[in-house]
Amino acid sequence: ITSIICCTEYIAAGAIKACDDLSLKIGKDISLITYDSLVISHLTNPSLTSVSHPVRELGNQAVNILLEMRSKKGKNKNYMATPTIIERGSVAKLLKS
């Protein structure tokens, strides 16, 4: 295993504990990424690389779609938001062969 991708910071906290138990150094021996960037990402050592979602934008779009559906003007819509990767110290550097 070269990396662990966690869907929440709370799961990442468990992964950090497991890596520690196995004497694996995050950011050197193994990479760890989380899919939210709340509080824990900043408190770990090394800080966790994370995929951050535009939560406010997603919420606004959801409300707009619901209001359109309620007024019966809206059709089924798809909305795609672009996440941002916030690089921190938890990703190991790749070795060139």
What are the residue ranges of the model-derived segments?
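Flexible loop/turn connectors
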Residues: 1-96
